[in-house]
Design a protein with these regions (language model features):
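Alpha-helix capping and helix-loop boundary segments enriched in small/acidic/polar residues
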Residues: 40-44, 115, 133, 364
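Glycine-rich nucleotide phosphate-binding loop and flanking beta-alpha elements
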Residues: 71-72, 107-109, 333, 358
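Conserved redox-cofactor binding core of oxidoreductases
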Residues: 1-80, 149-173
Length: 388
């Protein structure tokens, strides 16, 4: 693991601010600060495709089609018959012998369902899409972790900003990675994390920190030309709810994604408290020698309303969208799938991805989504065995 002096000091500062050091976030109570475990193998990111799909590519019962766009699920009455798709200029139909499984994520799965005529009639009819099955919850209940990216200038310490802003630094990082699979290019930006409560009334941690030895104005921009770090903090249990709605009957058109961050007083209060806590951490003795100076959002924001506005200015997705095909009872009008991940009111159609979460997890969503996939595969195999 790559070690940054600044991150070691920040962990000390978190402990001094009342967030205890821990060795493992997965011990049952994640409150505390520690260095993250990461999905990495020999200096290269590890993912579900490498861990699950690649070993299965040669199976005779698996065909993988790349560069193909799923357009809609074809329904035969209330039964899913398969998937209409396009690959290049060629249209095709993949018939389902047993069932169809959507795993396009919290944005893609509701989009495909709506294109198939499954969803809120008010969203489909204006686009000329016949309503095959009215299901009000499709695309609703969108949740995400909004990360508030506070940034601080520092002195007397190396950050990634200095290394990335010189040709020599870039060359050395690239060479180290190419030869040894070590160095900054082998690690995610956020190596240090923390879980804590925005105020003592919360029974468990409702904030998560991602601490990065770098800073930038927005994703895709170059790093700042001065040493700095980013303390990103997110509300783990937001009460705001958004939606995903298609804007066109054209499957190539991107849907409208409306997260509605900070839409509730509760979320705005947590955001203000989170920014205040981050400032308090920055004033701890462990960081004093680096003289941190807040420049995003800036020290002038002090009131709850001012801090909530600042949170909206510096906040951005942390790429954890969930909930748009939520699991629930058939009596719940907002529910899309049942406890076996089957779409309510339809046959031979399931959704197996992060969209089925009724509420977002109090932490990163990658591992929970893998667990949903594992559970989904168990359910499918069990039903196949019962059917003979």
């Amino acid at each position: 693991r790559l070690s940054w002096e600044l991150l070691v000091a920040y962990r000390e500062a978190m402990a001094q601010a009342g967030i205890p050091k821990v060795d493992d976030f997965n011990r049952g109570d994640n409150e505390g600060c520690a260095f993250f475990e990461v999905n990495q193998r020999r200096g290269v990111r590890w993912n579900a495709a490498k861990g699950f799909l690649r070993p299965a590519l040669n199976r005779p019962n698996l065909t993988v089609m790349t560069d193909a766009l799923a357009q809609r699920v074809r329904l035969d009455g209330r039964r899913a018959a398969g998937v209409e798709l396009v690959r290049g200029a060629d249209a095709a139909f993949a018939a389902a012998r047993i069932e169809t499984i959507l795993a396009a994520g919290a944005i893609g799965s509701p989009q495909i369902l709506q294109l198939s005529g499954v969803g809120p009639p008010a969203a489909l009819q204006p686009l000329g899409i016949p309503v095959a099955h009215a299901l009000a919850g499709v695309g609703e209940n969108l949740q995400d972790h909004l990360q508030l990216r506070m940034a601080f200038k520092v002195s007397n310490v190396l950050t990634l900003n200095q290394r990335a802003n010189s040709l020599w630094g870039k060359a050395m990082m690239g060479l180290e990675y190419a030869l040894f699979r070590t160095g900054p290019l082998t690690m995610p930006p956020s190596q240090l994390g923390g879980f804590t409560r925005s105020d003592p009334s919360h029974a468990t941690a409702n904030l998560e920190y991602h601490i990065q030895p770098l800073s930038l104005d927005k994703f895709g921009d170059p790093l700042h030309p001065f040493p700095a770090f980013t303390a990103s903090v997110c509300n783990l249990r937001p009460t705001s709810r958004g939606q995903v709605r298609i804007k066109s009957a054209d499957p190539r058109a991107h849907p409208a994604i409306m997260p509605r961050y900070l839409a509730t007083p509760e979320d705005r209060k947590v955001a203000a408290d989170a920014l205040r806590l981050t400032r308090r951490i920055a004033t701890q003795p462990a960081l004093a020698r680096y003289a941190p100076q807040e420049f995003k959002p800036g020290p002038d924001f002090r009131t709850d309303d001012g801090l909530a506005k600042a949170a909206g200015d510096i906040g951005t997705t942390i790429f954890h969208p969930v909930g748009t095909c939520k699991m629930g009872l058939a009596t719940d009008r907002a529910a899309v799938v049942d406890s076996r991940l089957r779409v309510h009111g339809l046959e031979r159609l399931r959704v197996v991805d992060a969209s089925i979460m009724p509420t977002i997890t109090s932490g990163n969503t990658n591992s929970p989504t893998l667990m949903i996939a594992e559970r989904g595969s168990d359910l499918i195999r069990a039903e196949r065995r019962r059917a003979g």
